[in-house]
Amino acid sequence: MADGLRVALVAGEASGDILGSGLMQALRARHPDIEFIGVGGPRMEAEGLSSYFPMERLSVMGLVEVLGRLPELLRRRKRLIRTLIEARPDVMIGIDAPDFTLGVEHKLRQAGLRTVHYVSPSVWAWRQKRVLKIREACDLMLALFPFEARFYEEHGVPVRFVGHPLANTIPLQADRAAARARLGLPADGQVLALMPGSRGGEVGKLGALFLDTAQRLLVERPGLRFVLPCASAARREQIEQMLQGREPLPLTLLDGASHEALAACDAVLIASGTATLEALLYKRPMVVAYRVAGLTYRILKRLVKSPYISLPNLLAGRLLVPELIQDAATPQALAATLSPLLDDGSQQVEFFDAIHRALRQDASAQAAEAVLQLVERR
C-alpha cells in the first residue's frame, strides 16, 4: 500500500461521530501516515478529521424538520460529492445516516472511488428493496450484527460482520453493588429500571404506562424500588408531571446515567429501541413494550417483515424476551410478565452472555482491517 493514505469519512449524528472516531484510531494504528477528510463531529475532529462543515447541519429529526431543511441538505450533499471526487480519497466511508450518506457513496462509486458503508440501515425489517440501492452504492457493508451480515450475503452485497463497539465498552460482568452505591440505592432488595425511551413522543406513550405498572408491582412486592434514567431535562420534566397526583413510588429519577441504572437494577421494563441492546449487554432480564399511534401501527404492520421488534430477539433468532406491543401493553400484562423475571431471569441472562461474547469483536479494529483490505485489493 502506498504511503499517504487519504480516507474520507462522512458521519451525520452523534452516534456516528463515536463510531467514526474509533475507526480513525484503529486506521491510524495500522497506517500512521494517513489523512482524514470529510464530515464529522467533535470526536472525529479530535482524531484529526478536517471537517468540511459542521456535522450538526446533517442532524435532522422528524419529517417536518427534514422538509424544512431539504434544500440545504441537498445543496451540501452536492457540494460534498464534488469536493470528494476532486480530492480522490483512497476510500470513502459513510457512517450510518443512510438517507444522506448512501447518495454520496453512490456518486463517488460511479466516479471510480471505493466506498464503504458502516452500520446497516434496517433493510432486513422493512423497505427491503433498498438493498438494491446499497449494492450499487458501496463496495463493502460493515455490519454490527450477525443477522445483518447474513441478510446481505443472501442479497449478494459484500459484507463484513465487525461486532458492536458497545460489546467491548460494557464489561462482561457489571458490578451491581458498585453501581447501586454510586446511585445511592440500597445494596439489598430488588430494583426495577423503567426505561420508557429518550424521545418525547415515546415517553408520552409509555411513561404513564410504566409508572402504572410499577405501582401494580409495588402492591405485590412492597420492598421493590425503581430507577428511571431521564435522557434530558425535558424528559425529566415530562416524567415529573406524570408523577403529580399519583400514589408515592420509591422511584429515583436520574439525569442520563442509563448505563448506571442498568448496572444497578435486577430487571428492566424498556421501550423497544437501541437501549434494549444495552440492557442485553448488562445481562438484565427485560420486558419490551411499545405503543405508537393507531394509524402508524397499522402501516408498520403492513411494512415490517421481521417477526420481532427488539434487538435481543433479532439477535437470538427467537422470542427470547417478551414483547408487549400496542393494546397488549397494559399495566396488568406488563406486571404479570415482569414478576417472574424478578424472581428468576436466568434463561434470558444465559443467552445474553452468549450474544455479548459473539458481538465482542473489537469493532473498530475489525472495521479498519476490512477497509484496508478493500484498499489493498485495487
Swiss-Prot record:
<keyword id="KW-0443">Lipid metabolism</keyword>
<dbReference type="InterPro" id="IPR003835">
    <property type="entry name" value="Glyco_trans_19"/>
</dbReference>
<dbReference type="Pfam" id="PF02684">
    <property type="entry name" value="LpxB"/>
</dbReference>
<keyword id="KW-0441">Lipid A biosynthesis</keyword>
<comment type="pathway">
    <text>Bacterial outer membrane biogenesis; LPS lipid A biosynthesis.</text>
</comment>
<dbReference type="GO" id="GO:0008915">
    <property type="term" value="F:lipid-A-disaccharide synthase activity"/>
</dbReference>
<dbReference type="GO" id="GO:0016020">
    <property type="term" value="C:membrane"/>
</dbReference>
<keyword id="KW-0808">Transferase</keyword>
<dbReference type="GO" id="GO:0009245">
    <property type="term" value="P:lipid A biosynthetic process"/>
</dbReference>
<comment type="similarity">
    <text>Belongs to the LpxB family.</text>
</comment>
<comment type="function">
    <text>Condensation of UDP-2,3-diacylglucosamine and 2,3-diacylglucosamine-1-phosphate to form lipid A disaccharide, a precursor of lipid A, a phosphorylated glycolipid that anchors the lipopolysaccharide to the outer membrane of the cell.</text>
</comment>
<dbReference type="GO" id="GO:0005543">
    <property type="term" value="F:phospholipid binding"/>
</dbReference>
<keyword id="KW-0444">Lipid biosynthesis</keyword>
<keyword id="KW-0328">Glycosyltransferase</keyword>
<protein>
    <recommendedName>
        <fullName>Lipid-A-disaccharide synthase</fullName>
        <ecNumber>2.4.1.182</ecNumber>
    </recommendedName>
</protein>
